[in-house]
Amino acid sequence: MATAIRDVGVWRQTRTLLLKNYLVKCRTKKSSVQEILFPLFFLFWLILISMMHPNKKYEEVSDIELSPMDKSILSNLILGYTPVTNTTSSVMQRVSTDHLPDVLVTEEYASEKELLASSLSKPSNFVGVVFKDVMSYELRFFPDMVPVSSVYMDSRAGCSKSCDAAQYWSSGFTALQASIDAAIIQLKTNVSLWRELESTKAVIMGEAAVVEIDTFPRGVILIYLVIAFSPFGYFLAIHIVAEKEKRLKEFLKIMGLHDTAFWLSWVLLYTSLIFLMSLLMAVIATASSLFPQSSSIVIFLLFFLYGLSSVFFALMLTPLFKKSKHVGVVEFFVTVVFGFVGLLIVLVESFPRSLVWLFSPLCQCAFLIGIAQVMHLEDFNEGALFSSLTEGPYPLIITLTMLALDSVFYALLAVYLDQVIPGEFGLRRSSLYFLKPSYWSKNKRNYKELSEGNINGNISLNEIVEPVSSEFIGKEAIRISGIQKAYRKKNETVEALRNLSFDIYEGQITALLGHSGTGKSTLMNILCGLCPPSDGFASIYGHRVSEIDEMFEARKMIGICPQSDMNFDVLTVEENLSILASVKGIPANNIIQEVQKVLLDLDMQAIKDNQAKKLSGGQKRKLSLGIAVLGNPKILLLDEPTAGMDPCSRHIVWNLLKYRKANRVTVFSTHFMDEADILADRKAVISQGMLKCVGSSIFLKSKWGIGYRLSMYIDRYCATESLSSLVRQHIPAAALLQQNDQQIVYSLPFKDMDKFSGLFSALDIHSNLGVISYGVSMTTLEDVFLKLEVEAEIDQADYSVFTQQPREEETDSKSFDEMEQSLLILSETKASLVSTMSLWKQQVSTIAKFHFLSLKRESKSVRSVLLLLLIFFAVQIFMFLVHHSFKNAVVPIKLVPDLYFLKPGDKPHKYKTSLLLQNSTDSDINDLIDFFTQQNIIVAMFNDSDYVSAAPHSAALNVVQSEKDYVFTAVFNSTMVYSLPVMMNIISNYYLYHLNVTDTIQIWSTPFIQEITDIVFKVELYFQAALLGIIVTAMPPYFAMENAENHKIKAYTQLKLSGLLPSAYWIGQAVVDIPLFFVVLTLMLGSLFAFHHGLYFYPVKFLAVVFCLIAYVPSVILFTYIASFTFKKILNTKEFWSFIYSVTALACVAVTEITFFLGYGVTAVFHYTFCIAIPIYPLLGCLISFIKGSWKNIPKTENAYNPWDRLLVAVIMPYLQCVLWIFLLQHYEKKHGGRSIRKDPLFRALSQKAKHKKFPEPPINEDEDEDVKAERLKVKELMGCQCCEEKPAIMVYNLHKEYDDKKDFLHSRKTTKVATKYVSFCVKKGEILGLLGPNGAGKSTIINILVGDVEPTSGKIFLGDYGSHSNEDDESTKCMGYCPQTNPLWPDITLQEHFEIYGAVKGMSSGDMKEVISRITKALDLKEHLQKTVKKLPAGIKRKLCFALSMLGNPQVTLLDEPSTGMDPRAKQHMWRAIRTAFKNKKRAALLTTHYMEEAEAVCDRVAIMVSGQLRCIGTVQHLKSKFGKGYFLEIKLKDWIENLEIDRLQREIQYIFPNASRQESFSSILAYKIPKEDVQSLSQSFAKLEEAKHTFAIEEYSFSQATLEQVFVELTKEQEEEDNSCGTLNSTLWWERRQEDRVVF
């Protein structure tokens, strides 16, 4: 009984989801560890930075008087000047003779260019003077003599040992400046002032005690703290959007989840995590050097509130994104960008404080303002304490308040955006929904509140809708009226549903049928509220599905199993069920009981502790269904619930749904008509979004069915013509459906049911016709569907392309031989014309073309290679620019008062102050003050002797009286780099002013261009060479690892079975990979040498690099091919190997260079070892040796290191490795590559003798089925027969396979798992044998052995006319057809290119291929998909392509492993018709495996059922039905006016005809019975009696059907259930308890 509607509390759901989120975090260890360690890592890094860059506290420093101006500093000075004029010569003459006669040597240069050129070869005592005019000049010292920076103000730390500002005094710059100034003054005034200028003294200004704060580490600390908290928001956003992307959030909402609970569960989890992390980080930060004076509680509050706001910030972003991979990147990027905005606010002193708080809604900015305030309080107060929350420029109390408000704002915005932003799934509210009264006052609705009038009137009943019986009137649970749904795709509108109207009733199971894309899932999504209808109306118990609030009430009754599996991957089956049971509101004390019941009902106890991501496809569907039925919901909406399940599991599900049908509404969609036929009470067929019909099985079959199906199992002596004549004699309208050596099938129309008894009686009498047994079954629902949907389309298709027989209409115009020439793929007559070498060349070119196309279209690999190239080029360009910018970094500095002194009207600046003027004379200095006024220099008079008291000032001037004129003392601030020469310039200009000269002397300091030292050049070049080696080794896996992908998708197996020669495969890839790698490597090497043209070039030694490169490229490519055979289970093989290659190259460089310090011999040993053992190293070693050998000044002592000696091994080893890799590649190809169909002309080692295998006789099994035993003896006889006219195409004899499964590691005990047990069967040419069995029965093992992927333990296999391990020429089977279960298709290759590749591999010419492609695409309806890449194809089209590829080349043997998996009924019919047609010519054979019995019945001539690795039965479908079938099923539909008394009489009559008949659940208009086999002695008598009853009683129609193959299958698989519980729990008789109108009884 359905459970009543539950009201689930928000808090309970929150606690449940909190547990779920906690478990998810615990099991996604990678992200969880990052969330914990990332902040701590950054915190410890910041502590390290703060320890390395502490605030520098300087004690008070008194004035320091420098030694007098010393002319001896300029001893041996070479002074070059330009231009050479009378004036300049006169000036320099006075300097060299009058002022500095003993120390100067002057040189003349015609131009500055000559002067600069000469400086390159001059020693460091060379100084240049460049006159601009007589009053202006440049002094050019070498950079190591004077400061070169353009920064005018240095830090206090810069003067701790040697002061840049004092360099101008110690280097002789000011002495030379004074000398030239004196010469200019003398030239202008004829007055010599050299003695006064020479007497000038210099004093370093004293400084007060100060704390100096370094801005750079402070900025790093600020931005790092912002980034430290980013993992919380990053991973939270990814988790939430990932759940949205998988539809998990909407899935939870369908089960009644409150939005509040969803948000709260994540918020509480991350609040707890951030609380703990913030507390830990605050304690560490305050206990270390980061914030040592602050209160840990205050720091904790700041960290915690920021972490919380960053979490809400991430929540706010989640509604804006549909892909989890995007939201994480954007969240991190936005965090960093806003962090830098905050950094700008904090560090830019001129930023207006009034605007600072405008950025506080950005939590990153608010946090940075708070951290900056903490640092300020640490620097100038006692730290951030509660008592100082309101102090400082940006009070902390405001920051904390703003962070709290930010969290609230982000939370509200997240909820709002989640409600209004349209997503892919779910209903959305209007943008102003919170202003509507209805949102705040929700009234609950009753079930039946909506009347007929509310839903556009009653739905009209017509001929396509079967009226329901009276007992269902008024039980309409789901009402659908005029539903329409349209989607917008690019520029067109796609209508998914078109005016759909019908009712779904309580107490019934309703099936939605239709091909893929017909609108079934869309209707399901509308009913559960995942998407709103475009038009029309639907209600669930009166709740409108398009209204969010009403849908919330309806969802409390709904259990849903969507088409895609809905579960939490990292949780176990039991945890998934328990958590979702709690979400649904099942009482806590009943959850364990309910979960255990679901586990038992669906036979999932054995997997209850398995994580969902580790389940098979069928097990995941069981879990999804188990979630849907939890708590007995009143409404079940199931979208393809049994997809991917084996028959045993399907029957378990059917039993469960039938058992829970009463008082409940069950709606399911399916592609399997038998499932709908058996399970559903009413079926709604939808086509192109429109309703085709609604009704019961008997209504649909009688109205649209083709009738009964008569199947006769015949012997080899059967007179088929006489038999057909007998059938048509009784039933003229009978039609032949199928005929082969063992079975004949006719269709018998409904209208002739009264003649059935006569026909069956005649068959019983004429036993001499060769009919061993016969049976009858009613038309299937599949037939009805196809008649309604696609029969005409299927019949019109041309399947003759798959057979050697021409189409009927072509027979007149073309002979069979002509068709063979134009349509057959590599026919026998043409095969001899294609030599092995010609085919080899064709295959090489084909593989090369395919490989090139794959690389071209696989954007990920191309992007990776381009990115690596760009990284290398970017590093080169960056270092080149740095090199040249450093080279030209010297800028002229004009030494004028404006640098450091304020003008009138200027605002104070950090390095501009007024000039302190101290009068140490006994008189006034008005003329000096007038000079400063005339020069626009603001002065401040100073009378104290302690300059510290007047700090900070850029400089001061102390005036001392001398005999003739003033003598000055220049007092300069050591942090003002250019203040001393500026003061000297002021003094010189004062003397000019005093002598009535209005011009002023101008001076520039322009150091010579600084050349990069040789050691820097060497290190730079070495670094780039090492980088080249590391980056280039990372590239080959991205384009040479395709083999790993081909093995994963089994494309390589498919190619080998198609006749691909292994050597052609590898050479075809190498033809592309080697030139590509060579070009890339040449570009990188070319750029390396182009950017370093100054390298000393040794052509002979460079040839060694070239020779190394020639062999290195193929060596690395071949090694990569070998590596592709390993680590096949790694998800991203290319990325893994790229990382391994790069790390290995880096490690080699590191080891060789580190051991350099241990001695040259050790380095050489490692170099030689790496060259020999590591194939990616030789070029790197060769290149580094060449570069080191090209350096100048290599010592030439006896024991010196000579890099040229290391070149030889690096050059030779790649050549030797190439040979080794070729042999290893052959070895791995033989070991892991699978069986080759053709002999390889190059890889001859692959054609070795096969291993000797044992062929023991199977143990005697007395219970072995007689047909299985007969098949074994038949195979044995055929194997020993040397003169048989025609052997079967496939023979399998005593095939046995065991696997060793190591269970106990400690005791090393091994358990043996038997996959197949001495299986024997054969498949004749022209026959299709169906291999059936549950999961684990051994079907896939047999297929894998046949294709060569698995070696059998014992047994023999013969394919075509040769054994699988024969060494004879195999031209008879040039290729084998193979359609594997997983699609072996390349995602970036088009459908047409697949045909061309496989056609060329099989030896087809391009002309033949065009014709074949045209006909195949027409036959299988593939024309519109020809130019689409595989990744854009629907699943059904992919399966068609796999089948078509398996049939190319006219293979004698074809293996079809579940060929129609994932197809809708229309596509399956196309496939089945093509398969049947392909094998009519009697020259091919096929082995087909399947889970679906209807496929076996439709396609197979014989069926073999495997259970637990053994063959249990084999024979035709009819033979197995007759032999193993348990009974029949009878359905009777009564006329509406029949009375209860007559129904009782009819029931007694049925009991009389069939004494052991068991009545199933029935309704007033339909009676259903299961009839044991023993009650049906003769079909003719049974039909005769039923016809009498039809005329006697008010029976409108009836159906009487035999058991299907499905029943036989389930009966036999019960044995496997008993052995290993791989199937579900079934009842003892395996007779499914049928309820209303199911064709088959189980």
UniProtKB/Swiss-Prot annotation:
Binding site residues for ATP 2: G1333, P1334, N1335, G1336, A1337, G1338, K1339, S1340
Membrane topology recorded in Swiss-Prot or TrEMBL: Multi-pass membrane protein
Keyword Kinase recorded? no
Task: List the transmembrane segments.
Answer: 32-52, 220-240, 264-284, 297-317, 327-347, 355-375, 396-416, 866-886, 967-987, 1021-1041, 1071-1091, 1102-1122, 1139-1159, 1164-1184, 1207-1227
For ATP 1, which residues are the binding ones?
A: G514, H515, S516, G517, T518, G519, K520, S521
Enzyme class name:
translocase
Q: Does the keyword Membrane apply?
A: yes
Q: Which residues are glycosylated?
A: N86, N190, N458, N919, N996
Which GO MF terms are attached to this record?
ABC-type transporter activity; ATP binding; ATP hydrolysis activity; ATPase-coupled transmembrane transporter activity; lipid transporter activity
- Per UniProt, residues of the ABC transporter domain are 478-713, 1290-1533
The record's catalysed reaction(s) read:
cholesterol(in) + ATP + H2O = cholesterol(out) + ADP + phosphate + H(+)
Entry comment describing in which tissues the protein is expressed: Expressed in testis, epididymis, lung and brain.
Domain of life, per UniProt, equals Eukaryota
Q: Which GO terms describe its biological process?
A: cholesterol efflux; cholesterol homeostasis; cholesterol metabolic process; high-density lipoprotein particle remodeling; lipid transport; negative regulation of macrophage derived foam cell differentiation; positive regulation of reverse cholesterol transport; regulation of cholesterol efflux
The UniProt keyword set, sorted, is: ATP-binding, Cell membrane, Endosome, Glycoprotein, Golgi apparatus, Lipid transport, Lysosome, Membrane, Nucleotide-binding, Repeat, Translocase, Transmembrane, Transmembrane helix, Transport
Tell me its EC number(s), please. 7.6.2.-
Gene Ontology CC: Golgi membrane; late endosome; late endosome membrane; lysosomal membrane; lysosome; plasma membrane
For this chain, the Swiss-Prot or TrEMBL PTM comment says: N-glycosylated.
| InterPro entries per the UniProt record, alphabetical | AAA+_ATPase (IPR003593), ABC2_TM (IPR013525), ABC_transporter-like_ATP-bd (IPR003439), ABC_transporter-like_CS (IPR017871), ABCA (IPR026082), P-loop_NTPase (IPR027417), R2_ABCA1-4-like (IPR056264)
Which Pfam families does the entry mention? ABC2_membrane_3 (PF12698), ABC_tran (PF00005), R1_ABCA1 (PF23321)
Q: Where in the cell is it found?
A: Lysosome membrane; Late endosome membrane; Golgi apparatus membrane; Cell membrane
**What function is annotated for this protein?**
Cholesterol efflux transporter in macrophages that is responsible for APOAI/high-density lipoproteins (HDL) formation at the plasma membrane under high cholesterol levels and participates in reverse cholesterol transport. May play a role in the processing of autolysosomes.
Family the UniProt entry places it in: Belongs to the ABC transporter superfamily. ABCA family.
Task: Return the protein name.
Answer: Cholesterol transporter ABCA5
Q: Which gene encodes it?
A: Abca5
